[in-house]
């Protein structure tokens, strides 16, 4: 009988599984790499390569190889870009890990491990970023069925809810609790909400050696479809962003109040602590209830004014079948009314003689100041006077290279050429641009130029589709020219009455208007940081914080320290200087390394839209002007839809609206983009949709065509042609296929 121990001196058979890589470096501005992994047992001649995954920074391979490893052998796993490897020696290198014999023994039979990619040599100039996930198993321990592992869980979901893994400047791993706003060295095992630490800001950390970060495969056995997970995250981001782009969003109720409705549909407000209820909206000061109704402008769509038997005025909301005593126009414009009221009080204090004999008229905001639609109308009139009467701004691009080709053509033009009538053509397509092609061009282009993959912008938060300028955009040496281009495109969208599909943080629009940034602006962008800074201001931090006037910044995996003031690293934050610290921190947070980028973007925007034309708008209004309404009001859509060769009782019409109501916000936006060329709604609602020759309503057209055909859109006329499908299920299937799988223009 052979002795098993005698095999220790010979090669050992191990199975290496290369599962996936994450966050690879992006070296081309307009293209993503085609990564593949190469496995080499150094000096033995054993060499294997995975399949190539197209156009991604997060490739997933899940391929295994049986290797014979000697006692002193090492294994090198390298990642390469297949697009570049044929150009020259060493081209296309994206990073590698080298496993020496002691590391192989340590990693063997421990499940999947996440390893940081490194350079080939310490003197190499290649930029490397990202991680690779691998496992090493003894060959005699492998069963017949391999475990399916979801790669995304190895990176994103291996911590309990509410926790995040970060690294200090020295590289040590720390764990951030977003619920209690505390940090710790030990890896958490329970959700963040179960930890009861006193609320305090993040602490600084001392330098220590970085421990090896491992992820056991057994903990990741519950697989889920990464595409579904990605779609859920994307949909949540989309919903969060859309919830911000209403035309008039009433402010939140005061703390302790709830809005409720009686069985008869009457809206009232309950103070939960005292149990007292009232018909009056607590958000609206009672001294504003006597404002002249005519000065407030028209009621929102679907509302009506009525009187009770005693003559008291109330308001009927036919959209929700409710009634209330508070004027809905006051809730919508409350911040403007109060601002105007404060301005008038200041003026009255400075003037000996009152210029306004009627207090009621004084409290009323002038319509041109309050009514966004009216202000937008004035802006359009002023812009139309700048548009040349002759000539066109002609741009021809391909869908595949829309960003690069648009950039080259737009940047060659003079600013006044961008004011000419916009005429867009997609190469190889016969569509004539009466507005619809331009809307689609802006829709597609905004998706490309605002994509964080290109490095110009980054998401301000993980849970919402709002963008901010990437302080590390300088990895592209021409980045300032691209920001200049983005500003021009935003200006062109506003000038020609179109919209950008995407949005920035509200402080960005505030800066675009030339206004200063405050701590309050931080709340929407980074609520955790905002809470931490507020905590610092409101509490005695003596002996609690070990902050200095130096902050850390993660630049593509590298921790960079920034001093908020000269020699800030050696200046501790205390009770005396904490206000200065917060002020400098806020200023750094919004302007860190982006001054040049923002000025380039602002220059491009103001070349098309002079800044003095925007002085009557605030940042929320500017966002709506640039991006339009994100929230789609289905009732408004129905009311402002024209029917052609069909009636409201036609099955096609009823089934169409049934499908629309079943769609989530993202698919409704895609349907709107399919028919009109834009996923955004004008500020005035669907009644203001523009066609080839002015306003043109959304149109449902039932056509006599084969029911195997897909619905067809005419973006210049906001019309969708629908064959007479036999069932709702078939219409739903065909409509879904059309909005998600088709593109291109033609001439009939």
Curated annotation (Swiss-Prot):
InterPro entries: C2_dom, C2_domain_sf, E3_ub_ligase_SMURF1, E3_ubiq-protein_ligase, HECT_dom, Hect_E3_ubiquitin_ligase, WW_dom, WW_dom_sf. The active site is at residue 716. Residues 414-748 form the HECT domain. Residues 1-119 form the C2 domain. Auto-ubiquitinated and ubiquitinated in the presence of RNF11 and UBE2D1. Ubiquitinated by the SCF(FBXL15) complex and TTC3, leading to its degradation by the proteasome. 'Lys-48'-linked polyubiquitination mediated by TRAF4 at Lys-119 leads to SMURF2 proteasomal degradation. Its EC number is 2.3.2.26. Widely expressed. Changing residue 57 to A: Increases auto-ubiquitination. Interacts (via WW domains) with SMAD1. Interacts (via WW domains) with SMAD2 (via PY-motif). Interacts (via WW domains) with SMAD3 (via PY-motif). Interacts with SMAD6. Interacts with SMAD7 (via PY-motif) and TGFBR1; SMAD7 recruits SMURF2 to the TGF-beta receptor and regulates its degradation. Does not interact with SMAD4; SMAD4 lacks a PY-motif. Interacts with AIMP1. Interacts with SNON. Interacts with STAMBP and RNF11. May interact with NDFIP1 and NDFIP2; this interaction induces the E3 ubiquitin-protein ligase activity. Interacts with TTC3. This is E3 ubiquitin-protein ligase SMURF2. It comes from Homo sapiens (Human).
């Amino acid at each position: 009988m052979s002795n098993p121990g005698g095999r220790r001196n010979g090669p050992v058979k191990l199975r290496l599984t290369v599962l996936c890589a994450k966050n690879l470096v992006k070296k081309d501005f307009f293209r993503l790499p085609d990564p593949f992994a190469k496995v080499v047992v150094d000096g033995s001649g054993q060499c294997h390569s995975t399949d190539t995954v197209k156009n991604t920074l997060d490739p997933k391979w899940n391929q295994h190889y049986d290797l014979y490893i000697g006692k002193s052998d090492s294994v090198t796993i390298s990642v390469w870009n297949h697009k570049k490897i044929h150009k020259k020696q060493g081209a296309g290198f994206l990073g590698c890990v080298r496993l020496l014999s002691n590391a192989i023994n340590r990693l063997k039979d421990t499940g999947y491990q996440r390893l940081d990619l490194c350079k080939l040599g310490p003197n190499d100039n290649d930029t490397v970023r990202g991680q690779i996930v691998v496992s090493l198993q003894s060959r005699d321990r492998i069963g017949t069925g391999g475990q399916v592992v979801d790669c995304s869980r190895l990176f994103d979901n291996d911590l309990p809810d509410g926790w995040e893994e970060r690294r200090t400047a020295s590289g040590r791993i720390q764990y951030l609790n977003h619920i209690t706003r505390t940090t710790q060295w030990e890896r958490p095992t329970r959700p963040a909400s179960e930890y009861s630490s006193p609320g305090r800001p993040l602490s600084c950390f001392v330098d220590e050696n970085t421990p090896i970060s491992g992820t056991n495969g057994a903990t990741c056995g519950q697989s889920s479809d990464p595409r579904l997970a990605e779609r859920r995250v994307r949909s949540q981001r989309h919903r969060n962003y859309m919830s911000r782009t209403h035309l008039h969003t009433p402010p939140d109720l005061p703390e302790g109040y709830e809005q409720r409705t009686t069985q008869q549909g009457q809206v009232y407000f309950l103070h939960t602590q005292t149990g007292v209820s009232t018909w009056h909206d607590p958000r609206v000061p009672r001294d504003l209830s006597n404002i002249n109704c005519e000065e407030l402008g028209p009621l929102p769509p679907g509302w009506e004014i009525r009187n009770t038997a005693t003559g008291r005025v109330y308001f009927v909301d036919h959209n929700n079948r409710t009634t209330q005593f508070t004027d809905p126009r006051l809730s919508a414009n409350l911040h403007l009314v109060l601002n105007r009221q404060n301005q008038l009080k200041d003026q009255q204090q400075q003037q000996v003689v009152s210029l306004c004999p009627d207090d009621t008229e004084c409290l009323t905001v002038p319509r041109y100041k309050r009514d966004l639609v009216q202000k937008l109308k004035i802006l359009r009139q002023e812009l139309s006077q700048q548009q040349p009467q002759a000539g066109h701004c002609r741009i021809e691009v391909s869908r595949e290279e829309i960003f690069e080709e648009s950039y080259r053509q737009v940047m060659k033009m003079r600013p006044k050429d961008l004011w000419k009538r916009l005429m867009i053509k997609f190469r190889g397509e016969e569509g004539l641009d009466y507005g619809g092609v331009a809307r689609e061009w802006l829709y597609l282009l905004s998706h490309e130029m605002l994509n964080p993959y290109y490095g110009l912008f980054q998401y301000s938060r993980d849970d919402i589709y709002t963008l901010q300028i990437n302080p590390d955009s300088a990895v592209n040496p021409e980045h300032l020219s691209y920001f200049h281009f983005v500003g021009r495109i935003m200006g062109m969208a506003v000038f020609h009455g179109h919209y950008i599909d995407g949005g920035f943080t509200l402080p960005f629009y505030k800066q675009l208007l030339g206004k200063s940034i405050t701590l309050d602006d931080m709340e929407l962008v980074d609520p955790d940081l905002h809470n931490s800074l507020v905590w610092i201001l409101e509490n005695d931090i003596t002996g609690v914080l070990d902050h200095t006037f130096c902050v850390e910044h993660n630049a593509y995996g590298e921790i960079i320290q920034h001093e908020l003031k000269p020699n800030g690293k050696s200046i501790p934050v205390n009770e005396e200087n904490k206000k200065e610290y917060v002020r400098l921190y806020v200023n750094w947070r919004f302007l860190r390394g982006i001054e040049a980028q923002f000025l380039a973007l602002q220059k491009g925007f103001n070349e098309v839209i002079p800044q003095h034309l925007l002085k009557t708008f605030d940042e929320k209004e500017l966002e709506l002007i640039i991006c339009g309404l994100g929230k789609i009001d289905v009732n408004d859509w129905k009311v402002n839809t024209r029917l052609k060769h069909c009636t409201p009782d036609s099955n096609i019409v009823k089934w169409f609206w049934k499908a629309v109501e079943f769609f989530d916000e993202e698919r409704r936006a895609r349907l709107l983009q399919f028919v009109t060329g834009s996923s955004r709604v004008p500020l005035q609602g669907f009644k203001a949709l523009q066609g080839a020759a002015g306003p043109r309503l959304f149109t449902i057209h039932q056509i006599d065509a084969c029911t195997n055909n897909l619905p067809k859109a005419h973006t210049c006329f906001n019309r969708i042609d629908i064959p007479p499908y036999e069932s709702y299920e078939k219409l739903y299937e065909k409509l879904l296929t059309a909005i998600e799988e088709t593109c291109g223009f033609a001439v009939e």
